[in-house]
């Protein structure tokens, strides 16, 4: 039976994906959020889903309410109204934990690589059988006859604890979200608790020291590049067209694969997907066929060309992700100068990982930095500035403003890699406008 869902904070990446999924399943869906444009809203608008400003008037007792995790009684009028009138609502992760029980569920967790791996797993599986999925780039799909459900499993504030998937991949464990986690041990404990809830099989990166300590009642399969792993990627060839490799399990090759993606991390992501689908009983020839057609996910190594200038947009906001993104850029463009334009995201993360950020950015040929993008959850106490990061980077590093990105023009034969989880796309847009204006003036 069709229901009406109202999403409080519908532009969030998980919330927008879930809204799209429920809409495609035939339910009536609407939501509210701030006016500021966010990249997820285009999909909502194309689907005809109404996006309203926050207001008590949006809510009626016959609706099922789903509230974004950031919204509370003290900062959101709709949550306050629901609590005042004793109208029940669920948080995104609470709803998802219940929703997935009707499917064979496949989760993807990890500090880095969740979205790309979820996207890859969803892409391959949906071409073999009816599959619903939620991807952290705001993409959601609800297949009416789906038996399988692929979803991204987020560790922040332990939001993945309501989830009990049949299968799960964990890509890695790393210290992040220092506003919540106290250290690496705390992060490990969260993932270990999640692992204990996986029912049929767990797939983890074998060269991650923390993941080697994970325990679960489900069988654990390690994937990676080492012969000690259960699923081993070998005979690897990385070219400007992507990556080719074979995978073996228990000493026997199970297939030869190509992914049109770049960087060592994407070979690992693909190997995790292959391992999961092999254990779940899918045909490896079909898996190989559908891996070839994967076109990526939003804001993960998204490329465009403006007047012969190559621009890459990526969500990378942690040192490990920066290294992976720059490695991918070098693979695809080995003869070009790699220019990193990075905006640190949150003061707490910048303070905690300042030296690691500097080390990661040294993988570029030149570095430009945007002022730190603070989270709504924190206050700038003046403890760190982007200039502190610039001083630690060994490569040439400059701080730029969104109003003046002209220093980026000082490079020939370059690839520009914009990275960040804040509003780095504003800087990207300024650069694109600058390039367009230069072309007009030269005509």
Curated annotation (Swiss-Prot):
Keywords: ATP-binding, Cell cycle, Cell division, Cell shape, Cell wall biogenesis/degradation, Cytoplasm, Ligase, Nucleotide-binding, Peptidoglycan synthesis. It is found in: Cytoplasm. Its main location: cytoplasm. Coiled coil: none annotated. One of its GO terms (biological process) is cell wall organization. The keyword Lipid metabolism does not apply. NCBIfam families: murC. It is an enzyme of class 6 (ligase). Cell wall formation. Gene3D superfamilies: Mur ligase, C-terminal domain (3.90.190.20), Mur-like, catalytic domain (3.40.1190.10), NAD(P)-binding Rossmann-like Domain (3.40.50.720). One of its GO terms (cellular component) is cytoplasm. Pathway: Cell wall biogenesis; peptidoglycan biosynthesis. It catalyses: UDP-N-acetyl-alpha-D-muramate + L-alanine + ATP = UDP-N-acetyl-alpha-D-muramoyl-L-alanine + ADP + phosphate + H(+). Its EC number is 6.3.2.8. It holds the Pfam family Mur_ligase_C. ATP binds at residues 110-116. PANTHER family: UDP-N-ACETYLMURAMATE--L-ALANINE LIGASE, UDP-N-ACETYLMURAMATE--L-ALANINE LIGASE-RELATED. GO terms for molecular function: ATP binding; UDP-N-acetylmuramate-L-alanine ligase activity. Belongs to the MurCDEF family. It comes from Streptococcus equi subsp. equi (strain 4047). This is UDP-N-acetylmuramate--L-alanine ligase. The keyword DNA-binding does not apply.
């Amino acid at each position: 039976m069709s229901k009406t869902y109202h999403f409080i904070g519908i532009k969030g990446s998980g919330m927008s994906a879930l809204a799209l999924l429920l809409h495609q399943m035939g339910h009536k869906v609407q939501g509210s959020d701030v006016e500021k444009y966010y990249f997820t809203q285009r999909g909502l608008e194309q689907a005809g889903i109404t996006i309203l400003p926050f207001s008590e008037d949006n809510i009626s007792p016959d609706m099922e309410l789903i509230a974004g995790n950031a919204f509370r009684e003290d900062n959101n009028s709709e949550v306050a109204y629901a609590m005042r009138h004793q109208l029940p609502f669920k948080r995104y992760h609470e709803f998802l934990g219940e929703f997935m029980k009707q499917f064979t569920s496949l989760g993807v967790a990890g500090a880095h690589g969740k979205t790309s791996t979820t996207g890859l797993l969803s892409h391959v599986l949906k071409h073999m059988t009816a599959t619903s999925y939620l991807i952290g780039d705001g993409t959601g799909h609800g297949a009416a006859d789906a038996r399988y459900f692929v979803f991204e499993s987020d560790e922040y504030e332990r939001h993945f604890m309501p989830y009990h998937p049949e299968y799960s991949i964990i890509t890695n464990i790393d210290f992040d979200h220092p506003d919540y986690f106290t250290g690496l041990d705390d992060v490990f404990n969260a993932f270990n608790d999640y692992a204990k809830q996986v029912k049929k099989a767990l797939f983890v990166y074998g060269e991650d020291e923390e993941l080697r300590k994970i325990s679960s009642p489900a069988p654990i399969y390690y994937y990676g590049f080492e012969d000690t792993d259960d699923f081993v990627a070998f005979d690897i060839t990385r070219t400007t067209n992507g990556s080719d490799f074979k995978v073996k399990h228990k000493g026997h090759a199970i297939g030869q694969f190509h992914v049109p993606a770049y960087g060592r991390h994407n070979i690992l992501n693909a190997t995790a997907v292959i391992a999961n689908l092999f254990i779940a009983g899918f045909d490896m020839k079909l898996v190989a066929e559908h891996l070839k057609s994967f076109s990526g996910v939003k804001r993960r190594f998204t490329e465009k060309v403006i007047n012969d200038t190559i621009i890459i947009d990526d969500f990378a906001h942690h040192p490990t992700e920066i290294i992976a993104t720059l490695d991918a850029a070098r693979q695809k463009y080995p003869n070009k100068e790699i220019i990193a334009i990075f905006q640190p995201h949150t003061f707490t993360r910048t303070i905690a990982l300042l030296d690691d950020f500097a080390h990661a950015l040294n993988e570029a040929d030149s570095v430009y930095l945007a002022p730190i993008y603070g989270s709504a959850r924190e206050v700038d106490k003046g403890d760190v500035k982007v200039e502190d990061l610039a001083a630690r980077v060994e490569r040439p590093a400059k701080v730029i403003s969104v109003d003046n990105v002209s220093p980026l023009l000082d490079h020939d034969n370059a690839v520009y890699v914009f990275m960040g989880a804040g509003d780095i796309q504003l800087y990207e847009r300024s650069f694109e406008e600058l390039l367009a204006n230069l072309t007009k003036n030269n005509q």
